[in-house]
C-alpha cells in the first residue's frame, strides 16, 4: 500500500500537519466505535453505534444480528455512512466514511473475522449466536477533519486511493 495523498489538495488546509493514508489508518484503528447510518426500503433513516475493526485495505468490519434494522436496510440498499471519532471531549477529529456494505463469505469472511477478532478478542464467543452476521464496508469516499488544528485540517480521499 503506497501513501495515498488527498483527493483535493485545496481541501488540505494545513500543510504543517499532513495527513496520509498511514496516519488515517492509525486514526481509524484507534477508535472502536462508530455511528453508522443506513436507509430502509421505505426510505426511513436508521443510525446506531457499532463496534468496528479496520483492515489494512481500509475495510470496516462489524458484526450484527440479521434481525437488526441495519442488516435489513443494508441488504436492501448497500450504501452506508459512518462517523468515527469526535467522542472524546476536547478532541474534535472525525472521519466521515461513505461506503458499500456486503456480507462476505468463505475465505474473505475468515480474513475479516481475524481483523475483527484482533480488535474484539471476545468476538469468537458470539460466533454461534443465531443470526450473527459480519458486515464489511468498502470505502467509496472518506473525509478526515481535524478541528483541533488552526486552521482546521480537512482531507478527502476516494476509496480507490486507499485500497
Describe these PLM feature segments.
Residues 2-16, 93-163:
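Charged, gly/pro-rich active-site loop segments
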Residues 86-87, 139:
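Short secondary-structure boundary segments
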Residues 10-34:
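Short, basic/aromatic recognition patches
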Residues 68-70, 89, 150-152:
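Short, surface-exposed beta-strand-loop junctions and turns on beta-sheet-rich folds
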Residues 32-33, 79, 121, 142:
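Generic structural signal for secondary-structure transition and capping sites
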Residues 66-68, 78-83, 113-124:
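Short acidic (Asp/Glu) patches
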Residues 28-29, 75-76, 117:
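Alpha-helix boundary recognition
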Residues 31-66, 74, 80-85, 93-97:
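Short beta-strand segments
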Amino acid at each position: 500500500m503506497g501513501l495515498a495523498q488527498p483527493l483535493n489538495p485545496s481541501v488540505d488546509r494545513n500543510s504543517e500537519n499532513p495527513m496520509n493514508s498511514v496516519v488515517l489508518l492509525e486514526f481509524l484503528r484507534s477508535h472502536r466505535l462508530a455511528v453508522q447510518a443506513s436507509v430502509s426500503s421505505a426510505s426511513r433513516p436508521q443510525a446506531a453505534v457499532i463496534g468496528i475493526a479496520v483492515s489494512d485495505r481500509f475495510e470496516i468490519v462489524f458484526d450484527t444480528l440479521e434481525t437488526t434494522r441495519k442488516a435489513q436496510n443494508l441488504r436492501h440498499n448497500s450504501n452506508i455512512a459512518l462517523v468515527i471519532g469526535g467522542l472524546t471531549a476536547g478532541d474534535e477529529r472525525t472521519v466521515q466514511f461513505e461506503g458499500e456494505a456486503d456480507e462476505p463469505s468463505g475465505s474473505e469472511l475468515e480474513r475479516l473475522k481475524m481483523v475483527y477478532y484482533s480488535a474484539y478478542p471476545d468476538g469468537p464467543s458470539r460466533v454461534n449466536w443465531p443470526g450473527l452476521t459480519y458486515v464489511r464496508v468498502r470505502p467509496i469516499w472518506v473525509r478526515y477533519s481535524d478541528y483541533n488544528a488552526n486552521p482546521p485540517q480537512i482531507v478527502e480521499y476516494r476509496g480507490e486511493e486507499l485500497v
